[in-house]
Amino acid sequence: MTTVETLEPTITAEDVQQWLAEYIADVLEISESAIDFDTPFHQFGLDSSAVVGLVADLSEWSGVAIGIKSIRKNNSIHALSQFIAAK
């Protein structure tokens, strides 16, 4: 008997970085090229409602349940993308 495994698609850190750069650039109405992946999130100037939206949308997109604490502990695009990719 042959067993068939179904694999869920893997999200890489690079996928998350791209998603976050697009999201933040859209919210701030700036070019994605202006986004530095090592800049702490609070330096982007996102207000609290934008951060809540980011958390909800990123959780839905990635399938990884994250919260505000995850962003505080992984306070840059680079750090958060590594955290999510490891889940």
Curated annotation (Swiss-Prot):
Residue list for modification O-(pantetheine 4'-phosphoryl)serine: 48
Cofactor(s) demanded: pantetheine 4'-phosphate
SUPFAM superfamilies: ACP-like
Gene3D superfamilies: ACP-like
Location of the Carrier domain: 11-87
Pfam families noted in UniProt: PP-binding (PF00550)
InterPro entries listed in its UniProt record: ACP-like_sf, PP-bd_ACP, Ppantetheine_attach_site
Keyword field: Fatty acid metabolism, Lipid metabolism, Phosphopantetheine, Phosphoprotein
Keyword Lipid metabolism: yes
Top-level taxon in the UniProt lineage: Bacteria
Gene Ontology terms describing biological process: fatty acid metabolic process
Role, per record: Carrier protein likely involved in the biosynthesis of a polyyne metabolite. Accepts as substrate the activated form of decanoic acid from TtuA.
Protein name: Acyl carrier protein TtuC
Native organism: Teredinibacter turnerae (strain ATCC 39867 / T7901)
